Curated annotation (Swiss-Prot):
It comes from Homo sapiens. Residues 156-170 have a biased composition (Polar residues). Residues 35-184 form the C2 PI3K-type domain. This is Phosphatidylinositol 3-kinase catalytic subunit type 3. Component of the PI3K (PI3KC3/PI3K-III/class III phosphatidylinositol 3-kinase) complex the core of which is composed of the catalytic subunit PIK3C3, the regulatory subunit PIK3R4 and BECN1 associating with additional regulatory/auxiliary subunits to form alternative complex forms. Alternative complex forms containing a fourth regulatory subunit in a mutually exclusive manner are: the PI3K complex I (PI3KC3-C1) containing ATG14, and the PI3K complex II (PI3KC3-C2) containing UVRAG. Residues 759-780 are annotated as: Activation loop. Pfam families: PI3_PI4_kinase, PI3K_C2, PI3Ka. The modification Phosphothreonine is found at residue 163. Ubiquitously expressed, with a highest expression in skeletal muscle. GO terms for cellular component: autolysosome; autophagosome; axoneme; cytoplasm; cytosol; endosome; GABA-ergic synapse; glutamatergic synapse. Residues 611-617 are annotated as: G-loop.
């Protein structure tokens, strides 16, 4: 083989030098802008398009692979042009040959000046660095320039310099291929003929460029020569063909970070300088400008779950004196304080007393686990003292949970000292009963007489201070002092604390919290015992309630042990209730009903007691009231009612908030009280499941026409009943959506003869649902037909009520979120699954990121989606068949 026929090459991985590229000339004409364009855009006067001579263009070059840049761009140096653009400059790219992947391409963009500090692209072109056979490009190349765009480095590129049409059709491409073949030695070289040929080729190329509508950029790739021999650069990657083993299992290698969890000295120094005492006097008179004021207003409007950035914290601290007139800003300010720094904490506490008093509902946030400073928590208690008993009752369930974040030692120190002999007798009784001191039956604390008090405790120890404008009361002391003044508060406080004392999970998982609740119950019992006659009577009534509930639990256990069907169990239930000597439940001394202490009961009517068709067979009981009436309840044994209790409390609160806004949605927030983790009471509302209504009457409207007919009303139904139905539907649709209530079917939607629709059975909340693809809210075809269909006036009213209710509840979102934040550590099933996400789930339903108008449109889309949910209708039919086969 002759020397000329040999192919000399070098691998790209062995050529450890930077890639070089020569920018030659730019051929073609730029489209001139009209005078009209100059009038519309005066900045064109500064661009090259407005110049008579060639403008001062420059070229940038950047290497891309897979749409991502491999290095920073480089650009040509400044050069003044007169008649043609000719840079004739070699650019050294910041990437080496071994670093180039097979699909590397270079993007070239030509730029023109367009006003001060601004440039616009004249055009761009892209060309791959390796040919289709893996050879690095060499020699001269005319690249087609795509006008008015930057070069595109993605794959496939939108600005190809060598398009398919130019490679196969035009004269320039054909000549370029022949030139390449000549350069590679595939043609016989004749010097005199080659000179004539190349001159003719240049003339043809010039003619083609002038006749074309495109511009062309000439670039040259470096040739590699050694000993007068030209070498081609072939793409090659060492070990590129070797297969890489895929590990099916691996071990985590933990690398210790010596600086992990250590203090960031720079941030700490900045924090201390920003919060130093020296800045205090100067910050006192600071007033924000309009932009800063708007930013502060945005920060203040954040929901309680929002974490402030360091910049936002510094801004709030800087203008803390300005914000003292805004009560809503206090919680945001307290979030900015580093309580580990004594000077900063001292400044914050001094400012706390000067701040405009916050609203009672906002103070609940200060009782969450995020605020541990005792002064801040006592400030929140001081604000709670401004709430009346009715409002306090709405928050009492959460306030009992907030005791978990109090100082347990302070609660224990509030216990009054007793005589040694009495203490020893109590300990002896406990030891003789075989019960561990940590497992004392909490009900015994209130039912057993307490030993006498030896002497008044020191002032420093007692927490039973009179209500006043001070920060002396902690949360435990406050709750006990208010409960001693109101029998209803005392009733619910007792049962809420009893449930926590008897929670076996808490006792095993967190013994300190369990002991704390026992101490709360002991202090409550002491406070009741040392009160006046009416307070001591209150204590005896609570003891009587506990005894009554214990007997009722004993009765339910006896009924459940009874063999036989439901009829036999019913007979056994009525027989045991009638045996007053054995059970003593049908005729007792007058006591408050634990479920609703305003109702005084004398016992249970035996002959009316029945068991429901259910796995746990809850009992429907009718209590004899003081005035001779009947009060129906459901007593469940073997079921934890705390989740239902929470949801009904929130529904009751929402009903109160909506009524406060003059919006009565005819809700039915029936009462639920857990008397233990295994049993409790539910108020019974005379009603019919919607599924039964549809089976017996055919439709909801037929049901209403049967019990509330009216010739003048809509569809022959009383206007008042229809209005009640529409409003209750709207209220529960919005509320169950916000609370994420799941497992909705027509058997747990109940309907009264007065038109009230309401939900029961809240075993799935916060987005949990046993059914796949549930709709956002329970609103099916039958419910809409009960209003008269989607075209009826009642349905349009329903939609309006939904919008109004949603907007009102959004304004109280902080209160609702604060209540849920206090429940994150409660042993409630659907909260315990993901306690850290509980508040976020509720917050997401409020869509606080939307304006009121956007929120209305969002609610519209939810209603439409729910009405037309096809899969939900299929699931409802499956549930209906399942219920049929169970029967």
């Amino acid at each position: 083989m002759g020397e000329a026929e040999k192919f000399h090459y070098i691998y790209s991985c062995d050529l450890d030098i930077n890639v070089q590229l020569k920018i030659g000339s730019l051929e073609g004409k730029r489209e001139q802008k009209s005078y009209k364009a100059v009038l519309e855009d005066p900045m064109l006067k500064f661009s090259g398009l407005y110049q008579e001579t060639c403008s001062d263009l420059y070229v940038t070059c950047q290497v891309f692979a897979e749409g991502k840049p491999l290095a920073l761009p480089v650009r040509t140096s400044y050069k003044a042009f007169s008649t043609r653009w000719n840079w004739n400059e070699w650019l050294k790219l910041p990437v080496k040959y071994p670093d180039l992947p097979r699909n590397a391409q270079v993007a070239l963009t030509i730029w023109d000046v367009y006003g001060p500090g601004k440039a616009v692209p004249v055009g761009g072109t892209t060309v791959s660095l390796f040919g289709k056979y893996g050879m690095f490009r060499q020699g001269m190349h005319d690249l087609k320039v795509w006008p008015n765009v930057e070069a595109d480095g993605s794959e496939p590129t939108k600005t190809p310099g060598r398009t398919s049409s130019t490679l196969s059709e035009d004269q320039m491409s054909r000549l370029a291929k022949l030139t390449k073949a000549h350069r590679q030695g595939h043609m016989v070289k004749v010097d005199w003929l080659d000179r004539l040929t190349f001159r003719e080729i240049e003339m043809i190329n010039e003619s083609e460029k002038r006749s074309s509508n495109f511009m062309y950029l000439m670039v040259e790739f470096r040739c590699v020569k050694c000993d007068d021999k030209e070498y081609g650069i072939v793409y090659y990657e060492k070990d590129g063909d070797e297969s890489s083993p895929i590990l099916t299992s691996f071990e985590l290698v933990k690398v210790p970070d010596p600086q992990m969890s250590m203090e960031n000295l720079v941030e700490s120094k900045h924090h201390k300088l920003a919060r130093s005492l020296r800045s205090g006097p100067s910050d006192h008179d600071l007033k924000p400008n309009a932009a800063t004021r708007d930013q502060l207003n945005i920060i203040v409007s954040y929901p309680p779950t929002k974490q402030l950035t360091y910049e936002e914290q510094d801004l709030v601290w800087k203008f803390r004196y300005y914000l003292t007139n805004q009560e809503k800003a206090l919680t945001k300010f307290l979030k900015c304080v580093n309580w580990d720094l004594p000077q900063e904490a001292k400044q914050a506490l001094e400012l706390l007393g000067k701040w405009k008093p916050m609203d009672v509902e906002d103070s609940l946030e200060l009782l969450s686990s995020h605020y541990t400073n005792p002064t801040v928590r006592r400030y929140a208690v001081a604000r709670l003292r401004q709430a009346d008993d009715e409002d306090l009752l709405m928050y009492l369930l959460q306030l009992v949970q907030a005791l978990k974040y109090e100082n347990f030692d302070d609660i224990k120190n509030g216990l009054e000292p007793t005589k040694k002999d009495s203490q020893s007798s109590v300990s002896e009784n406990v030891s003789n009963s075989g019960i561990n001191s940590a497992e004392i039956d909490s009900s015994q604390i209130i039912t057993s007489p307490l030993p006498s008090v030896s002497s008044p405790p020191p002032a420093s120890k007692t927490k039973e201070v009179p209500d006043g404008e001070n920060l002396e009361q902690d949360l435990c002391t406050f709750l006990i002092s208010r409960a001693c003044k109101n029998s209803t508060l005392a009733n619910y406080l007792y049962w809420y604390v009893i449930v926590e004392c008897e929670d076996q999970d808490t006792q095993q998982r967190d013994p300190k919290t369990h002991e704390m609740y026992l101490n709360v119950m002991r202090r409550f019992s002491q406070a009741l015992l040392k009160g006046d006659k009416s307070v001591r009577v209150m204590r005896s009534l609570l003891a009587a309630q506990q005894t009554f509930v214990d007997r009722l639990v004993h009765l339910m256990k006896a009924v459940q042990r009874e063999s036989g069907n439901r009829k036999k169990k019913n007979e056994r239930l009525q027989a045991l209730l009638g045996d007053n000597e054995k059970m003593n439940l049908s005729d007792v001394e007058l006591i408050p009903l634990p479920l609703e202490p305003q109702v005084k009961i004398r016992g249970i009517i035996p002959e009316t007691a029945t068991l429901f068709k259910s796995a746990l067979m809850p009992a429907q009981l009718f209590f004899k009231t003081e005035d001779g009436g009947k009060y129906p309840v459901i007593f469940k044994h073997g079921d934890d009612l705390r989740q239902d209790q929470l949801i009904l409390q929130i529904i009751s609160l929402m009903d109160k908030l909506l009524r406060k806004e003059n919006l009565d949605l005819k809700l039915t927030p029936y009462k639920v009280l857990a008397t233990s983790t295994k049993h409790g009471f539910m108020q019974f509302i005379q009603s019919v499941p919607v599924a039964e209504v549809l089976d017996t009457e055919g439709s909801i409207q037929n049901f209403f026409r049967k019990y509330a007919p009216s010739e003048n009303g809509p569809n022959g139904i009383s206007a008042e009943v229809m209005d009640t139905y529409v409003k209750s539907c709207a209220g529960y649709c919005v509320i169950t959506y916000i609370l994420g209530v799941g497992d909705r079917h027509l058997d747990n939607l109940l309907l009264t003869k007065t038109g009230k629709l309401f939900h029961i059975d809240f075993g799935y909340i916060l987005g949990r649902d046993p059914k796949p693809l549930p709709p956002p809210m329970k609103l099916n075809k039958e419910m809409v037909e009960g209003m008269g269909g989607t075209q009826s006036e009642q349905y349009q009213e329903f939609r309006k009520q939904c919008y109004t209710a949603f907007l009102h509840l959004r304004r109280y979102s902080n209160l609702i979120l604060n209540l849920f934040s206090l429940m994150v550590d409660a042993n409630i099933p659907d909260i315990a699954l993901e306690p850290d996400k509980t508040v976020k789930k509720v917050q997401d339903k409020f869509r606080l990121d939307l304006s009121d108008e956007e929120a209305v449109h969002y609610m519209q889309s939810l209603i439409d989606e729910s009405v037309h949910a096809l899969f939900a209708a299929v699931v409802e039919q499956i549930h209906k068949f399942a219920q049929y086969w169970r029967k």
